[in-house]
Every structure is written in C-alpha cells, then in structure tokens.
C-alpha cells in the first residue's frame, strides 16, 4: 500500500498530481473549496483539457485510491504527505498573492491533530515563501520543525525535524 496523501487544490496542478499519485498506488484525497468542482470531480467530470486525465480520474475513483472533498477534516488528519497546489494569482503590482497559501496552511494546521506530515508547496510562490511567518508559523507553532527550501522551480518543503 502506498502513502496517504492530501492534495490541497484540485486545479490544473493539483488534480493532475492527485490523479498521477493515485495511479502510482497512493491513497490520495484532493481538497478544494469550490463545491461545484468537487461534485463534478466525484463524477469524473474534469473541467479542463489534459490528455489522459479523465481516464486517470475514472481509474482512481474506481480503484478507491482517489477521493475528492471540500473538507480538510477528511484529508489532513491521516495524511503522510500534504501537497499545496492552490492558486496564487498576481496582485495589481505583479507579485504573487499568497492569501490562498496562508488560508490553506491555517486550515491544515487546524486539522493536524498532533500529526506532523511532510508538507510540500507546489503552488507558484516566491523563493523563501516557506520561511515566511505568514506561510509557515501556523504549521510550526509548538512543533519542532525544519524548513527545507529549494531556490529553483521545484518546491518548498516544511518537514519534521524530530
């Protein structure tokens, strides 16, 4: 059996990642605040074109490896890994608007129940976002943690350091 994975955001990045991880044998739950999107995804209705994605979603649903919810409580408490794949639209000044990342980290922190999963940020965000208090302090409060950050396009990881 694979890892238990939560993917926060079921848009272009999150949905493709969730379906791919489910195909690899992981138990994946994708969370999105868009209720209509979740209702559609539970019926394998993918709202954008990505070659082969509908088939992957159908297979994931049929195998029981892929789940969709609008509730963090259904995805976070048992997750070994959490991928953040939320929208970060540009502000009027052109910088990334990190409100969705902040909101997601607060929601994650509220459902961790003492567990300390590895959290990977796949959202488009400036270098060092994982080190900023607005992004990581809520998750790191009263928990020994280490922040590992890559300065290239890959990802930022907030992880255990026990």
Briefly describe each language-model feature range.
Residues 33, 45-59:
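Basic, amphipathic N-terminal segments that precede the first structured/catalytic domain
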Residues 131-136, 141-145, 149-155, 159-162:
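Low-acidity, Ser/Thr- and Arg-rich intrinsically disordered low-complexity segments
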Residues 78, 84-86, 122:
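Short, well-ordered coil/turn residues at beta-beta hairpins
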Residues 53-80, 90, 109-113:
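A structured beta-alpha segment of the ubiquitous adenosine-cofactor-binding alpha/beta core
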């Amino acid at each position: 059996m694979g890892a238990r994975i939560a993917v926060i955001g079921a848009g272009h990045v999150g949905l493709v990642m969730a379906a791919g991880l489910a195909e690899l044998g992981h138990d994946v739950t994708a969370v999105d605040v868009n209720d209509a999107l979740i209702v559609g995804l539970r019926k394998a209705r993918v709202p954008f074109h990505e070659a082969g994605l509908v088939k992957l979603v159908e297979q994931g649903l049929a195998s029981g490896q892929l789940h969709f919810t609008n509730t963090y409580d259904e995805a976070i408490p048992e997750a070994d890994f959490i991928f953040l794949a939320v929208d970060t639209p540009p502000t009027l000044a052109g910088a990334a608007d990190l409100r969705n990342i902040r909101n997601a980290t607060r929601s994650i922190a509220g459902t961790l129940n003492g567990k300390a999963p590895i959290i990977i940020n796949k959202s488009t965000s400036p270098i060092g976002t994982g080190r900023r208090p607005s992004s990581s302090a809520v998750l790191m409060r009263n928990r020994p943690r280490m922040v590992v950050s890559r300065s290239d396009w890959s990802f930022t990881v907030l992880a255990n350091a026990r």
